[in-house]
Every structure is written in structure tokens, then in C-alpha cells.
Amino acid sequence: WLTRRFAYDSFSEISHAASDKDWLDITTEWMKDFISYSEGKYGKKIIAYILSGGGTSEWYEYDSGRSSRIKNTAWRKWCSRNNISLGEDVPSESSLQIASHENVIYDPQTEMHKIQYWRFHNEIIADAVLHFAKEARNLISLDKEIGVFFGYYLVSDNKLVSFGHLDYEHVFASSD
């Protein structure tokens, strides 16, 4: 039912889903209901919860810079929060595929918009992970672990920035 409600699939487009407050709200309520039910019925047998989302339930995607109305809106809000002025829309998918230095490294002098876009992309996914961990922790006792499959930074070079895991230090530092 959830995939029919939105114009994207959170399995393959987690950054788009994570950019959507409605998706976050609905999914959070579903998770909280699931945890409450599980704790009530099986709580004494459960020692950990794994929070999963995105590609293969590991919070990644290979979107290569595709955008959407909802992600453009989130980009503008992110830029505003970070006092960055880089335009109304995210950089085009085709421009993100080109880098000044041997087509591998962006030039901060001329391609800062691309660097900041990928920072936004990775942060929006990490923020979703942390959001769900915090909401889950409120319902789960401290003696139970909460985990995620996240933080793969040794993936193929042409997919690394769009993979969504480059804000792993933020996630790993979480107390939740």
C-alpha cells in the first residue's frame, strides 16, 4: 500500500523517500506500531532490532543524481539551513557524471554545487537512519541493541558518492 501512495519506491530511491516528510511520518508510525506489537507479544525474546530501508534494506541507492520534485524541495531547505546558495534545483544528473580532474574528482573552485549536492544526498539518508533509530530507541529498552546495515564506503568508485553512505561517521556517532 505504501508504494502506491508515493511516486517513488523507497527501496530503490531512499533519498527521495527520506526527503518526504509524509513518507517519514507514515513509515515512522508503522515502525512504532510494529515495535509496540513486537515488544508486547515477544519482548522477552527479542534482544535486538535491525532498522532497514533502501536498497537491499541497507539504506543505499544508486540514483546517479536523479532528482524529483520532493528532493528538489529538500535540497532548497538544506541549502537554506546551511547558508548555501546554489540555485533552486539540484545539479543535473548528466553534470554530476562529469568531474574536472580526470573525470574522478570535482574541482571545489568550479564544481562546489556538485560537492554540496552529494553532501546533501548522503546527509538526507543518514538523517533518516538517525530519525528512525531515535524513534525506535524511545520504545526499546537500553538493554536491547538497535542496528542498521550502513557505512559501506569501500564500494566501486563510480557509485560511491551516490551510494548514500558517506555520512557514516554521523550515524556511527549516534548513541541510539
Where do the PLM segments sit?
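Polysaccharide-binding and catalytic clefts of secreted carbohydrate-active enzymes
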Residues: 2-175
